[in-house]
A protein has these predicted regions:
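Cleavable N-terminal export/targeting peptides
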Residues: 1-19
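Outer-envelope beta-barrel architecture signal
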Residues: 17-23, 64-68, 109, 123-129, ...
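Predominantly the C-terminal beta-signal and adjacent terminal strand-loop region
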Residues: 14, 77, 165-170, 175-221
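Residues on the lipid-exposed face of transmembrane beta-strands in outer-membrane beta-barrel proteins
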Residues: 25-29, 51-59, 72-74, 111-117, ...
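Outer-membrane beta-barrel transmembrane strands
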Residues: 104-111, 117-120, 126
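Short glycine/proline- and aromatic-enriched beta-strand/turn motifs that initiate or cap beta-hairpins
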Residues: 13-60, 220
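Early exported N-terminus immediately downstream of N-terminal targeting peptides
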Residues: 65, 70-80
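Extracellular/periplasm-exposed beta-strand and loop segments of Gram-negative cell-envelope proteins
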Residues: 33-48, 77-107, 137-165, 196-212
């Protein structure tokens, strides 16, 4: 990422709004975080709010009708699961058949990789759509759990959570030119997780993926 930022300062200035590489900052309110279990006996038990924030970089195509979009961002996510199967769950032995409720609070250092296509500019405004993937490295995992009359909060769950999260990234929105080299960026995005969030050897469950819906808000310079 350091190479990307350094290289961006050395690019010739041409293309859309007079530059090949656009850098910016973003903050994405995440209004849906859902842990999605793929087997019976485990249910979604609520969706949490979250936020993404960090650096954006658009490497412009030569015709300025699109870009390779990447960046570096911190992702915060939280969601809950209800384990009804007595043979599954992190505290299945202690729960002795009782339903177990878990709330995972996750943090990732994430790199999005996507192609962003753009419409023609009209009065400083243009539409965009993107399709790609993302890779996230786990940097924080805390857990709240309860079963029967027992409960505990903010347990360190780094060793019980898989260290990598990957998935499909899609989004759409618009850009509006505020000044010669300042563009307002906005839209909506969806992240469909492919990887398993919970370690199966500890949780004795099948795949549990993380899906997210977020608003895209940022400024390019």
């Amino acid at each position: 990422m350091i190479c990307l930022v350094t290289g961006a300062t050395l690019f010739a200035q041409r293309g859309f709004y007079g530059r090949d590489v656009r850098l910016g900052f973003k903050i994405d309110p995440v209004f849906v975080n859902t842990l999605r279990p793929l087997e019976n006996g485990i249910e979604k038990d609520g969706s949490g709010f979250g936020v993404n924030y960090g650096l954006m970089a658009d490497i412009q195509f030569s015709d300025s009708r699109g870009a390779f979009a990447t960046g570096l961002e911190v992702q915060h996510a939280s969601s809950s699961l209800l384990y009804k199967d007595a043979g599954k769950g992190l505290y299945r032995d202690e729960a002795v058949g009782a339903e177990q409720s878990y709330k995972l609070k996750l943090q990732y250092l994430q790199i999005p990789l996507s192609v962003k296509l753009k419409s023609n500019e009209n009065n400083g405004f243009r539409w965009w759509g993107q399709f790609g993937t993302y890779m996230g490295a786990l940097i924080g995992s805390r857990l709240d759990y309860s079963y029967g009359n027992t409960s505990e909060e903010n347990i360190n769950a780094m060793n019980k959570t898989n260290k990598l999260n990957m998935g499909l990234l899609v989004g759409a929105g618009g850009e509006y030119r505020l000044a010669q080299k300042t563009d307002l960026y906005f839209g909506v995005g969806f992240e469909n997780g492919f990887t398993d969030i919970t370690k199966n050897k500890d949780w004795k469950d099948d795949k549990v993926a993380l899906n997210r819906w977020a608003l895209r808000l940022g400024v390019f310079f």
